[in-house]
Each structure stands twice: as C-alpha cells, then as structure tokens.
Amino acid sequence: MTNSNLRTENHFDYVKITLASPDRVMEWGQRTLPNGQVVGEVTKPETINYRTLKPEMDGLFCEKIFGPSKDWECHCGKYKRVRHRGIVCERCGVEVTESRVRRHRMGFIKLAAPVSHVWYLKGIPSYVAILLDMPLRDVEQIVYFNCYVVLDPGDHKELKYKQLLTEDEWLEIEDEIYAEDSTIENEPIVGIGAEALKQLLEDLNLAEVAEQLREDISSSKGQKRAKLIKRLRVIDNFIATNARPEWMVLDAIPVIPPDLRPMVQLDGGRFATSDLNDLYRRVINRNNRLARLQEILAPEIIVRNEKRMLQEAVDALIDNGRRGRTVVGANNRPLKSLSDIIEGKQGRFRQNLLGKRVDYSGRSVIVVGPKLKMHQCGLPKEMAIELFQPFVIHRLIRQNIVNNIKAAKKLIQRADDEVMQVLQEVIEGHPILLNRAPTLHRLGIQAFEPKLVAGRAIQLHPLVCPAFNADFDGDQMAVHVPLAIEAQTEARMLMLASNNILSPATGDPIITPSQDMVLGSYYLTAIKPGASVPEFGDQSRTYAGLEDVIHAFEDKRLLLHDWVWVRFNGEVEDEDEIDKPLKAESLSDGTRIEQWTYRRDRFDEDGALISRYILTTVGRVVMNYTIIDAVAAA
C-alpha cells in the first residue's frame, strides 16, 4: 500500500530466526528513493549538528537514509505539509513522509575488511570452532591476528591444511620459497584475520562433510563419537536452514533505526544519547581509517593492526565484554551493546515483548490467610474497586443508584457503603487469577474466589504456596481479572486452586502442609513433659464434650497442653494400647467399667458401650474439633 497511514496485516504461521546473508543485510538497509537514488550506507560517525541541531547527512541519524525527523518536512525545509507526500527533495535528498518511519528504517555499514561475528566465535559452544574442527584457541589466534593459517600447502612438504604458523615461522618459509635454489612451484597460501576464517568456511562442502561424519560415527565410540555427533548436528542445521558457514563472518553491519537508539537534549543544552551510538561511532571511525590506510597502501603491519581494532569494535557493538576489555563510557560504566539490550530480565524480550502491562491487573505483597478456604484469596478493597470498576459502574446504573458513569465514578471515589455492597455482589462468584513470577509451570497461575479484606496485601491460603513456590517474606503476586464469560468458566473449571491438587510434572500431591502448618500441628498436639495428669472425676478437668473443652480454653480456664478427661463416643485408636484393661470393675446395676491408659469405657449388661471418656490434651481436642468441623462443612 502506498498510503503510510494504512497498516497492512500479514498472517503468518511461525517466526524463524536464521543467519542473515550479506545480501540480506544490504537488503535491510538499502533503499531506492522514488527519484532512483540508492541510499542506506552510513559513512560518517557524526550524529547531529550542534549548531542547527539537525541530523548530519550520511551520519548515524541521517534523514536521507532513515527518514525525516519531523512529519512531512524535508531536511532543508523546502517541502513542508502532507500535500508533498512521497516527494524526494532535490536539494537535500530527503523523502517527505512521516517521522515514524525512523522507528523501522535501517541502514548499514559496509566494512573495509570482513569481521567475525562474536556470538558464533566466542559463544558456548563455538560454532565456528566446531565447523572447522579446530580448537577455539587456534581460531581466536587467527581472527585476532596472532597467527597465520595455511589455506593451501601447495608443494611444501612440511605444511598441512589449517596448520597455524607464527610470524617468524612464516618468514622462514617465505625465505625458503623465494630462495634462488627453491624447487617449489606451487607456492603455499596462508591467511590471517577474519578474511582467512571466511576462506576456510567457504572451502567447506557441508554435504560431503556430513556424509563423511556419518561414516566415521558408525565406526567410532566414546568421546570421539560424541564429538563427531556434535559437529554433524551443527552441519545438519546449516543444511536444513539453507545457511552458509561463511555468513558467520560479516561484510556489512546493519544499523538499527535511529528512534531505537535516540539522542535527547537535556536542560542546559547537554545531550543524552544511547550507548549504541558510541559503539557505532567507534566502528565507523575505525572502518573509515582502515579504508583510508588501504587506499594509500600503508604498511601491512599498520593495516593489520587497524583490522584487529575494527574486529574489536564490532565485537563490542554486538556483545560488549564477551571478549577482551569491556568498552566503558565517560563515568566508567560499561556501554550497553546489542546483546545487553536483548538479553536478561530487563531485555527487549522479557521486559517489552513478554512482560507487557495489561489492563484489569494489579500487584501487591502476599500475606498468609489462614481463615480462607483453599479456593479463596483475600483481595484488598482498594484494589478490588479499581479492578472491578466497570462491573460496579454497570450494576450501579442498572440498580438506579446513579444515572450516568460520571456520577458512578464520584460515588466510587467516596467509597460509600452502597458501593461496597455492590462490589460484594459483583465479586461473588467472579474468579480472579493470581500469578507469581517466575511462572515455571502451569500451577504458577491459578484461579481463586476473591474475598474483600482490609489493608493493602493479598491474602493467600498457605496450602497453595508450594505450587507458586511462594513464601511470606515479601513476595509479590499479580492479580488478573478474566472478563469474558468463557474465560471465567475456564478459570473456574480448570484453574481453581482446589482442582489443582496434583503436580502435573510428577503426579504427586503438590498441596502439602509445610513450614508454619507442620510446626503449628506439632505444637498443637505435643505433650508437655511433666504436665500433671488428673484423676478421672476431677471436676476442673472432666468435660461432657469437645465443645466444652474449647469454651474452657477460650475462657482461659485451660492451657493448650493441659490434660483433660472428655466424653467422646467415637472410635479411638492408640498404638500404645495394651491388650487388657488396667482395671475392670462390675457395678451393682449390671454395668461394667474398663479403665485403660488413655480412656475409660462403661458398658451395659449386653456389652454395648454406654459412655466413653478419653484422656487427652486441650490442643488435641482443638485439632480434632477443627478437622471434624471442616469435614462436616464440606
């Protein structure tokens, strides 16, 4: 489409990341203007003119290459307004279009000498070293101009293909070759730097090497076999993606759009600029100097030193600090390279692409909510009113409490009781999603029924903590509101915490008591050493039921670890119970009493149980009563 206001939609199945060929790099940056002029190459290290504050031509912010810095206005000001759309100014060569093109138009730097891509050279594993079947140290010696490499041994008997030679060794061989009595006709060819590396990679016939490797693998064992498989895997990937190994050596470097590496003016006339501009400037300066030295036929040692410096400048641009000394700025801070911008938590992917802010979401610290049910969470009122505001406004209008949205918002700001009542109705049965970063498995996001709570912290049931890998030492969690009925249904059916009891990885229960719960359960049921055991019938320590013990404990007449006799007609299991009762007594009314270590039973004439009193602690009564109460409620 010619109209730049219209956005085209491209439907695609997948995104593939492969090595870019030199032609592809040029394609990204090179454009043919409507007047037939080809632009795209950045040749000057300048950014902006400090008097006019306009971008320098052919520099890192050039308007001819990247587009105008002001909407519908060329560099020299001859053409202004949208009516000149698409015209290329004959004076300055800038196309009249929108300034936002400076966010996606790229340029390129044509290098005076090839340079190796530091990711493939110094990455782990080093793909260059694997492909060439050479040690990484040797490859580095070649790239950084420390050693020559034999590209063609010719007729020389002592030289081998890919053999490394020091400067002195090569000088000796040269003297031997050019001696008057030399019998060598085909002279050996050696190379140094990324040019030699490129030649070695160009000489690789991937299909033949892959075939040979397959034969070698079938007859190899152990470490050698593993090494061959590793090399074959890399070669197969190159073949499958139609990429050439020599593309790991760069002839041109893409220059990213200027609005992605901006330069802004601060108060007082100073400028703040992206670190990338400094790194690009180093590359351009060294590249231009190398081109000039090659033009004037400078001595080989000077040219070689300049090529090494260019290699180091490109390394710093792509991944500063990966090799050699880290390039630092004015205040001794390492400059952020392209890799630093992409990788890590603050990188482009995790921060900007995967970590986008979304509507109807919030974030707060989590605290324990022991009184919640497992499928519930405590949502602060302040957060709930903000998250569910559209639902609250809709209900306020529908119930004729207010007439319009503006009045509803005023009512919400005052936090009237009516609003809280409506909010309570809205959240009833509306699940919310809780997420704790990092979300390493599907249980990192679960659905809960919200309960309004005071304060500003989200309350979480302690049993769901293992699934989130959460604890209450300052962890934060994000809240998301599913809006559509389908999303709410899915959250309730599939994501509710009470439906996710087993770990999807192992099948073992992930809802297990831990930490505070285990300690609390132990403390509640522990027996205090030396605590006095009352005789049966002691009025202050004998109770008719579990509730009476609970009431006595709440009234502070009993302590948690006090022994009590309590009537309990349920089943009692005790591993320490002896086979026979300690004491058995028949009464005159025909009933029989049996005294055991921890219980006292009374039976009628037919042997049916009339009453049972058990000896236990107050804490154990509390525990038992709580479990019975929870089971009955379920």
From Swiss-Prot:
Cofactor names: Mg(2+); Zn(2+)
Top-level EC class as recorded in UniProt: transferase
Domain of life of the source: Bacteria
UniProt entry keywords in alphabetical sequence: DNA-directed RNA polymerase, Magnesium, Metal-binding, Nucleotidyltransferase, Transcription, Transferase, Zinc
Residues the entry annotates as binding Zn(2+): 74, 76, 89, 92
Entry-linked Pfam families: RNA_pol_Rpb1_1, RNA_pol_Rpb1_2, RNA_pol_Rpb1_3
One GO molecular-function entry: DNA-directed RNA polymerase activity
Enzyme Commission number(s): 2.7.7.6
SUPFAM superfamilies to which the protein is assigned, alphabetical: beta and beta-prime subunits of DNA dependent RNA-polymerase (SSF64484)
Residues forming coiled coils: none
Membrane-traversing stretches: none
Catalysed conversion reaction: RNA(n) + a ribonucleoside 5'-triphosphate = RNA(n+1) + diphosphate
InterPro entries: DNA-dir_RpoC1_gamma (IPR012755), DNA-dir_RpoC_beta_prime (IPR045867), RNA_pol_asu (IPR000722), RNA_pol_N (IPR006592), RNA_pol_Rpb1_1 (IPR007080), RNA_pol_Rpb1_3 (IPR007066), RNA_pol_Rpb1_3_sf (IPR042102), RNA_pol_Rpb1_clamp_domain (IPR044893)
Residues that hold Mg(2+) according to the record: 471, 473, 475
Cofactor binding note: Binds 1 Mg(2+) ion per subunit. Binds 1 Zn(2+) ion per subunit.
Functional note: DNA-dependent RNA polymerase catalyzes the transcription of DNA into RNA using the four ribonucleoside triphosphates as substrates.
Name by which UniProt lists this protein: DNA-directed RNA polymerase subunit gamma
Organism for this UniProt entry: Prochlorococcus marinus (strain MIT 9303)
